[in-house]
């Protein structure tokens, strides 16, 4: 393991024992810090409106998928504790296969797999599906897009 070379004492191969340099090796990513500030500035005035929009879409998606035989929604929470993200599995498909079909045949983008949390899938029972299909909705997601996803999954599960 190699380490050392700080912004305050570049020739010293030991990490500092005191101060912020102990935890912050290298230069701060000022461009990302500035971008984060701008993102907050742009989204903050609409935050409540965006959250309500996401929750409306979430209800539409949850209601639509829950009526399809063989689809299991994971991690359902009370709406007031939810954001525009929903994970599900289908008993006829592994998550990667379903994601690929949705992409190639329906032009719908979802995230599939273990989502950087492989051990959680043992707990939620999605290992046999190769993880989950995760849908993320935001400001620019439309009800039409959510309905298209529901209809695509329904069509695939009825084949």
Please identify what each model-predicted range represents.
Residues 1-159:
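Pyridoxal 5′-phosphate
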């Amino acid at each position: 393991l190699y380490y050392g070379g700080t912004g305050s004492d570049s020739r010293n191969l030991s990490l500092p024992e005191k101060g912020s340099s102990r935890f912050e090796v290298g230069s701060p990513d000022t461009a990302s810090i500035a971008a984060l500030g701008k993102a907050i500035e742009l989204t903050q005035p609409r935050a409540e409106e965006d959250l309500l929009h996401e929750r409306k879409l979430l209800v539409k998606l949850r209601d639509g998928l829950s009526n399809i035989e063989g689809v299991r929604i994971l991690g359902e929470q009370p709406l007031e504790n939810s954001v525009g993200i929903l994970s599900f599995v289908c008993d006829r498909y592994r998550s990667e296969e379903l994601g690929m079909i949705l992409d190639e045949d329906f032009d719908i983008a979802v995230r599939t797999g273990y989502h950087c949390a492989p051990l959680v899938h043992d707990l939620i029972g999605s290992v046999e599906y190769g993880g989950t299909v995760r849908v993320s909705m935001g400001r620019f997601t439309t009800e039409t897009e959510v309905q298209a996803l529901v209809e695509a999954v329904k069509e695939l599960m009825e084949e």
